[in-house]
Amino acid sequence: MNTKIGLSLSEKYYWSWKTKTSNCPCFSCSGEGNIVINKVSGEKYLQYNLTYLKDIWAPLKELNLEKQFDIIALVRGGGLTGQTESIQLGVARLLCQMNPQNRSVLKPFGFLTRDARIKERKKYGLRKARKAPQYSKR
């Protein structure tokens, strides 16, 4: 029994993924449909934002598996939106790991696609990444 996350090694699935600047190892096991993020309930961690919760459950709803699995995620870095996207991607990859036939159902909805956009760095001489100081001709 892995006491750190409360799962035995024989009944859990694991996948780790990154989105933007957030990193999210996800674990899944059979259960009643609970979400635990960083050892806190998912609703409380995501500040009771229903949009974030729907995004996490979307891959499971497409496969009609909402009440069959518990999701445990350990998220680091980024904001709540980036963390939610990385959890969603981790859940979708877990479902493909459990059953490779799920890939054909999840792929058209974009659940298996990583959003590769990241923040552009600030360049010297500029105020932000691309914002230049005002130009004066004379």
UniProtKB/Swiss-Prot annotation:
GO terms for cellular component: chloroplast; small ribosomal subunit. Keywords: Chloroplast, Plastid, Ribonucleoprotein, Ribosomal protein. Disulfide bonds: none annotated. The gene is rps9. It is found in: Plastid, Chloroplast. This is Small ribosomal subunit protein uS9c. Signal peptide: none annotated. One of its GO terms (molecular function) is RNA binding. Belongs to the universal ribosomal protein uS9 family. Gene3D superfamilies: 3.30.230.10. It comes from the Eukaryota. GO terms for biological process: translation.
